[in-house]
Amino acid sequence: MILGIGIDTVEISRFQRFLDEDNQALLNRLFAPAEQEYCRPRKQAASCLAARFAAKEAFVKALGTGLRDGICWTEIAVGNDQLGKPFLKLSGRALQLFSEQGAASAHLSLSHDGGHAVAQVILEAP
């Protein structure tokens, strides 16, 4: 059973600006270290970061809470499996609320094109 669906789109140029300005404090507030390590070396680092941020926004929309209830951006991280498929890695309050909602899995899709990154999250019960 589907518990929630969230979608978000962001402008990649925002994240290019963060990288150009070397705004490490902001990047640390928005992204887990593993996310930064994955995206920074890539040719399209801004697209990579933008898609991950869109995933975080889509997750809190699917959860139905927004960023209330003490969720931090870094508690919602995006990883990739061996084939490159993205997945959510939740911790802290984000994981707690996910469990309290009765969710068993989160499905994630990312894309970027034409200056925008988009993410969709579907939360599913067992």
UniProtKB/Swiss-Prot annotation:
Name of the protein in question: Holo-[acyl-carrier-protein] synthase
Cofactor(s) recorded in Swiss-Prot or TrEMBL: Mg(2+)
Family that this chain belongs to: Belongs to the P-Pant transferase superfamily. AcpS family.
UniProt entry tagged with the keyword Lipid biosynthesis: yes
Function: Transfers the 4'-phosphopantetheine moiety from coenzyme A to a Ser of acyl-carrier-protein.
Transmembrane segments: none
Residues reported to bind Mg(2+): 8, 57
Keywords: Cytoplasm, Fatty acid biosynthesis, Fatty acid metabolism, Lipid biosynthesis, Lipid metabolism, Magnesium, Metal-binding, Transferase
EC number assigned by the record: 2.7.8.7
Pfam families, sorted: ACPS (PF01648)
Alphabetical list of InterPro entries matching this protein: 4-PPantetheinyl_Trfase_dom, 4-PPantetheinyl_Trfase_dom_sf, ACPS, Ppantetheine-prot_Trfase_dom
Taxon lineage: Bacteria, Pseudomonadati, Thermodesulfobacteriota, Desulfuromonadia, Geobacterales
